[in-house]
Amino acid sequence: MEKINFHDIYKPGHTVLENELFFHNHNPDMLLQYDSNFISFKRMPSVQEFEEAHHYLRDFHQKYGQKHVRFYFPDGEELSGELLAFFQKDEDYTVGFLELFAILPANFPQVQEREEIIVENVTDETWNDYLEFQYEQDSVYGENFAEKKKAQHLRNYCDESILQLIAFYKGKAAGSVDVIIKERTAEIDGLMVHEDFQKKGIGSRLQKSVMDQFNDKTVILVADGEDTPKEMYRRQNYRYIGKQYNLLKVYK
């Protein structure tokens, strides 16, 4: 298996500033998306360095009407005691972590075919089904966010390096996943199953379709450290690669 780390994970947007301490990713098309507007530290900062980076990012985001700051810390490193103590002084800071998993497609378990589940690559014929499904899921974060995501989904549809899949259960849109295609990896992104159709094997069928179409690549994905699906990934023979701490603060 190829050596994989968090740098292989796709982040929409572009770098607007880079120095020896961090790089700053900005996504003007999705200002409301926390995970594509952030600072990622190359090394663990001191408290003073963090405060300076926080001040810079807050000022930058305010110019664009953004009401959050998001930080990622170096792969596989624990937060220092000084940083943790500093974060605990502000109850609006949320510390979390992501876990990175990878699998060779041949190691993915066999999935039983069920005729009521159909998985397809999104085409012009199924585009509206995909878009309506995504809009319903995105609306949880507000109508404004969902509208912005519609434009992003269209950009992704036109991007040859991104493949969108949709699953139908008895003819109804029931799940979806995007695949970020790179030279050596295929990244599973946004794997979702509608709450009305969970525990029917739809998520596994979506993943199996990815494995079948990209059997020459390492398939990777990121799971929130607090989410339960990561246990499912382990059962499906994904290999745990490592974790990365992050910090979020949302301003009112």
Label every PLM stretch briefly.
Residues 1-64, 79-80, 148:
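N-terminal charged segments
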Residues 2-7, 44, 98, 104, ...:
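Short amphipathic alpha-helix that is part of the acyltransferase structural core
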Residues 10-15, 65-67, 78-79, 154-165:
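A short helix-loop-beta-strand connector motif used in the catalytic cores of GNAT acetyltransferases and
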Residues 50-117, 247-249:
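Acyl-donor-binding surface of acyltransferase catalytic domains
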Residues 50-57, 190-195, 199-213, 231, ...:
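Conserved acetyl-CoA-binding loop-helix of GNAT-fold acetyltransferases
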Residues 64-74, 213-225:
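Conserved GNAT acetyl-CoA-binding A-motif
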Residues 78-93, 204, 226-243:
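Conserved active-site alpha-helix within GNAT-family acetyltransferase domains
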Residues 142-192:
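A conserved beta-strand-loop-helix scaffold within acyl/acetyltransferase catalytic domains
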